[in-house]
A protein has these predicted regions:
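ATP/NTP-dependent adenylation/nucleotidyl-transfer catalytic domains that generate, transfer
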Residues: 6-26, 41-51, 58-61, 70-116, ...
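Conserved G/P- and acidic residue-centered "switch" motifs that form tight phosphate/ATP-binding loops
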Residues: 33
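Conserved SAM-binding loop
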Residues: 67
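His/acidic metal-ligating clusters that form di-metal
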Residues: 120
Length: 262
């Protein structure tokens, strides 16, 4: 992979898109994870205005520390970068109390609240984006966005542009190393940070990113039954998740009215 060439390509693509959209730059949500670290660094290299937002909601201290350290590093390196921490915990707590229901009656309550966290962050990003004339830069990678749908509809999936959505997680790590993203972020176990209890991406999806990348490469030309053991299991997981996520990537269905009814 031509890492430097890919970096230059994405940075130029970002600059061109912002110019066409007549935007001043980008706002990026920074979580302390690898994807947001890479996207924010790429945005910083455009020399356009960049606002980094850290938006903790009952967040673990290690995630907060990584996010704040990363924002500090970028501010030191790039004069076009500004950073802000917006604690969304009080707003989320108020929302959760207002809509509280019995978990016994509604077993999907915790999942609904996890997605609500993501949507609250999306609302915040667009609020600050509109204040400053900035585009919301998404941080989803190829596996998450087009493979297994590991994102929240109208949450972290609600963005203006997706700079790294054509890169697998492994490729994102390669860019991170080239961009000199901190070792703490590069070594951190991937997690979406949407739960009160620690849940890694692998635990939630049932497979690691390298495993899912393999499954994505053989999906369509092979079936789970073509393999044995763990490979069969992983491809079955990928197939199930990929089919279930189609509503996230397909256009919103529109009820077409027959011509004769007009």
């Amino acid at each position: 992979m031509q890492t430097q060439a890919i970096i230059r390509h994405i940075v130029q693509w970002l600059k061109d898109y912002a110019e066409q959209a007549r935007a001043k730059g980008f706002v990026v949500g920074v979580s302390g994870g690898i994807d947001s670290a890479v996207v924010s660094t790429l945005a910083a290299q455009t020399d356009l205005s960049v606002l980094l937002l850290e938006m903790p909601i009952r967040q673990k201290s290690d995630q907060v520390n990584r996010a704040q350290e990363h924002m500090g590093r970028l501010k030191q390196r790039y004069p076009n970068v500004k950073a802000q921490s917006v604690d969304l915990t009080p707003a989320f707590d108020t929302f959760a109390d207002t809509v509280d229901v019995s978990e016994t009656e509604f077993p999907n309550k915790q999942l609904a609240l996890a997605n609500a966290r993501s949507r609250l962050r999306m609302t915040t990003l667009y609020y600050y984006g509109q204040l400053h004339g900035l585009l919301v830069a998404g941080t989803g990678n190829k596996i998450e966005d087009f493979g297994v749908g590991f994102f929240t509809k109208y949450g972290d999936g609600g963005v203006d542009i997706s700079p790294i959505a054509d890169l697998t997680k492994t490729q994102v790590y390669a860019l991170a190393a080239e961009l000199d993203v901190s070792e703490d972020i590069q070594k951190a176990v991937p997690t979406d940070g949407l739960w009160d209890t620690e849940r890694t991406d692998e635990e939630q999806m049932g497979a690691s990113y390298p495993e899912l990348e393999w499954a994505m490469s053989v999906y369509g030309s092979h079936k789970p039954e073509d393999f044995e053991g763990r490979q069969r299991e992983v491809l079955a997981i990928y197939t199930r998740l990929h089919k279930a996520m189609q509503h996230k990537v397909n256009p919103i269905p529109v009820c077409k009215i027959p011509e004769e009814l007009f």
